[in-house]
């Protein structure tokens, strides 16, 4: 299968056929037919995306094995353009899984598929999704082999990347797989010209995979919101995001785009991938049709090929805030008729509020803006019952700005700690905080969370000040969402459960405000609680830091009420012990002797 042609044509495609933008069939069973999707996407795009999707669902199959299935699905789709059989009228997702289930090799290679194929949609699609392996091991060719393939058989190299990227990221939006493939092609061309190819590939692939994980995390986060909160939460988040990105868009247009974005996200999360992809491409075209009303920065995106255009729009920086928005917003706190407007249609009125503050305040995070809208709603619910509502809600704007100042101050405090002490000590500070908040979590998970939080701090504290809060709170909320997903499967404690379920917009601030878990009962210290051996003496710096962090976590779990100065004292004593024992003639006997002395010293500090 010669996929290099596919990739090149994907990149050079122009506009796709537009499909009834913003018109939604009220029938819940409405779906596009496969001939419509095939025509809209073109054959080459259809085959490329089909390869990505089958690779995500049949992860053990080789590229050669999947080629036959891809061609079979493609031939059937092509036949449906002129031959409208009853089967062609089925939803695209249904047809896709019909083809998978009809393939004898699928039943042989995937025993579980028999159970899935016996189900009806949407349960069948959900069953396949549930069996995706998220721990699949990637096959990474050596740089020399990669460069040889690039020179002699570039089609094989790129098709292999689509296959590998898709099965290693089974929930990644398939067009994103193709966009990443294009970047990989450029990366390979660049690194194959470098003298130190191995270093170049290592550094560039790390960046590309980080981008891949980021796209997948954001996509997964949207689905997590839909699964755990009312749909209006996702709509509000999208409205804040659209208003941030396109501040000159009026409310009606911003609201329409919000509805469209929310609809295609729902299709993606329900695993209706063909519907999802078609709608994403439609939204791209619709965005370009309205570029003058949306953003002065869209021109550069709308003049490039389709695949690049979609990625360009998704990653586009916010447009400049129009000069007329520099004036204070008065219509929500100074208008004497606020309560009448709120009573007339509270959802639309609150949407207008969220749109107004989001387009004006790009320096504020979407999560803060959602929380502000929720607090404004509470304010109106209270004030509109009083004898003098305007007097009651007139301080709403001051309250909003004071809360924003507090949030900025907290962010600055953490960035100052990071800059003063460095990432590793900042990571340890976070590790202490979160071990006290949720001591029930495993040592390695806590260390991983602290490391990811420190990475977010390192990245977001380095961006311009007016971008820090959106960066930090956006990324932290995604990380906390993952934590909450684990909490749902493996209960941590009541305080964490409350933060995960009470309010999406307040989730990050809820976790920040959490104190030590007062209900936690520390386990008794045994000989197995702490383990020190001479491996630390030969460990590299990174490994030594990890060993120290494991000691920190264990220490807090058995002595959760230790104050910061006592934790620092114990850490210093730990380092003294390591220094002493690693210079002793016999390392292990020294550790065995010094361990109980260290533990007893630290336990005496515990109140």
From Swiss-Prot:
Residues excised as propeptide: 19-24
Keywords: Cleavage on pair of basic residues, Copper, Disulfide bond, Lipid-binding, Metal-binding, Repeat, Secreted, Signal
Main location: secreted
Tissue: Plasma.
Signal sequence coordinates: 1-18
Family note: Belongs to the ALB/AFP/VDB family.
Protein name: Albumin B
Record organism: Xenopus laevis
